[in-house]
Amino acid sequence: MVSLLRCPSSKPYSSLICSLTLGAVVALSGVAYAEETKPAETVPVVTPPKVISQPATKNQVRFTKTGAFDSDTVVKIAKRLAAKPYVALKDPLPAGLAKLSYDEYRDIRFNPTASIWRDQGVPFQMQMFHRGFYFQDLIEIAIVEGQNATHLAYEPKYFTAGEVITQALPNDDIGYSGFRIHNQLNTNGVFDELMVFQGASYFRALGKGNAYGLSSRGLALKTADAEGEEFPIFRAFWVERPYNDSNLIVVHALLDSPSVAGAYTFSVRPGDNTLIDVEATLFPRVELSKVGLAPSTSMFLHSLNGRHDTDDFRPEVHDSDGLLMLNGRGEHLWRPLANPRQLQVSAFSDNSPQGFGLIQRERDYASYQDLEAHYERRPSLWIEPVGNWGQGSVVLTEIPTESEIHDNIVSYWKPRQPIPAGSEFHFAYRMSWGDEPAAKVGAVHVSRSASGRADIAKATPRRLFVVDYQIEGPMTDEMPVAKVEASGGVVTNVVIARNAAKNGYRLAFELEPEDKELIELRAELKFPTPRQVETWLYRWTL
C-alpha cells in the first residue's frame, strides 16, 4: 500500500508531508513544511544562535556558483548532469542537527528581520529553511540580479534558536533545505506566506484568503508502482530579484533523480487566484514510461459521498473533494474523490487536454465544522496545459487512509508514449491556486454528491446516489432528461427534480451491485436547448 504521511493539518503552526511507499520510507526528503508567519512589521525578540566551536564539514558549491546567469543556464546544467550516471549527493550534517527531534527542528526559526529584500521596496520577501530532522538534503540557492547570480551561503545569523533546541548551529555553509516566498497577499503592509519549496520536488502556494492544503511536485515517477515510487529532488534554486513595481517573481530550479534531470522555471503572480506559469525541460537518463506531468497531491478522508464508517464529529474532512477535467473535446467532467478500502487507480484517456485539477468545491464552514483546520479555505489547483500535450491520460490515484494526517490522493498527466532516454522533452503549463476557476466550470455543474443505503429500514446492498446540479444564471422552465450508465450491476429508479435550494436540479438513482466489487458510474443531463453541462463520474467499490 502507498501512503503519504503528514502531521495533522489541524495544527495551526505547521504541516508536514513525508513520502512513504510499501510500508517503507523511500524518500525522507519528500517533505513539505511551513510554519506560521508573522506580519512584516512585527520585530520579534531574537535569540542569538549558538555557534558550533568546531566547524562542520564544509560543503562544496556544485550548482549555484556566483557568476553569469541567463535563461539557459539551468537547462545547460541539467543536460550536463543527465549525461552522467546519477550520483546520490552526500552532504553530512553535524551529528546534532542530523538527529534533531521534530520539536527541536521546529524551534529553529528564520529571523524575519533577515528576510531577503526586506526594506528594499520589493513586493516579495524570501526566507530559508534550516536543514535537520527529515530535511537532510542540502539545497543550494542563488539570488539573480540582472545577468548575474550570487550564491546564497548559509549563515547562522539568518536563524533564531528557541528554548527547545539544545544543538548549536554551525558556522559553515551547510546550505538550506528549502525556502518560502512572502507577499502582501491578503493585507497591505503585511507579508504573508505565498509559496513554499521544501522536500524532494514538492511545492505549494496560496491564493488570497487560503490556508495551506494540497501540494504539487515537479515530476511524478512510478506512482503506486509495486517496485516503489521514485522521488526526484530540486537540488538547486535560482531566485530572481523582483522589480520594485512588479507583481511577478521568477524561480528557476534544477531537478535530479536516478531516472532524469531537468530544468524548471516558475513565474509566480499572486492574487485572488495565484497564477504560476511552469516551463520545464527534461533530460531522461532512462526511458520514462511511468511518468506523471504536473502532479498534485491531496487528502480526502470522508464526505457525504462514499464510505460512512468514520466516527467523526465533522461531516466532511478533505483538502480536495473532486477531480475536475476539461478534455480535448470540450467536455466538462467531475469525478468526486473517494477513500477506498483498497488502492484505486483511474485513468481518463484524452487527446490534447484543456485542463484538469484537484478542486475543493465545498466552501461552506458548516460542511466541515473544524475551527482549526478550516478545510473550507483550502485552495483548489487547476492545471492548464500550454500547447498540445497530445494523447495520454489524466491519472487519479486514491489510497486508503484512516486519518487526515495522510495525503492519499494523487493526480497527474501521463503521456501515452514513453519519453525516450537521451531525449530533450519540453512541456509547459499554468497553475491556478485558489478558488475554483469559474471559466472552466460548466454552466450547469455538480454542487454536491452523496450516497447511502437505499433502504434505511433494513440492510441492503442497494445504494442510493444523489447528485445536485447548480445553474449559473436564472432557472428556466426546461426540464432535463437524465441518463445514467453503469459498467456493472443494475441502475433503477432514476429521478430528476428541480432543486430550488441549489438553483438547479437533483438527480437520484439506485444501484444494485449484484456480484460486482467495482462499478464505474456516469451520469449526464440533456436539455431541450443545448447547454454546457458537467458529466458526473464515480467509481463505486465495496
Curated annotation (Swiss-Prot):
Gene3D superfamilies: 2.70.98.10, Immunoglobulins
Pathway assignment: Glycan metabolism; osmoregulated periplasmic glucan (OPG) biosynthesis
Any one GO BP annotation for this protein: beta-glucan biosynthetic process
Keyword tRNA-binding on entry: no
A GO CC annotation given for this chain: outer membrane-bounded periplasmic space
One annotated GO molecular function: catalytic activity
Stored InterPro entries: Gal_mutarotase_sf_dom, GH-type_carb-bd, Glucan_biosyn_MdoG/MdoD, Glucan_biosyn_MdoG_C, Ig-like_fold, Ig_E-set, MdoG_OpgG
Highest taxon above the source species: Bacteria
SUPFAM superfamilies linked: E set domains, Galactose mutarotase-like
Location relative to the cell: Periplasm
Family to which the UniProt record says this protein belongs: Belongs to the OpgD/OpgG family.
Function: Involved in the biosynthesis of osmoregulated periplasmic glucans (OPGs).
Protein name (record): Glucans biosynthesis protein G
Origin species: Shewanella baltica (strain OS155 / ATCC BAA-1091)
Gene responsible for this protein: opgG
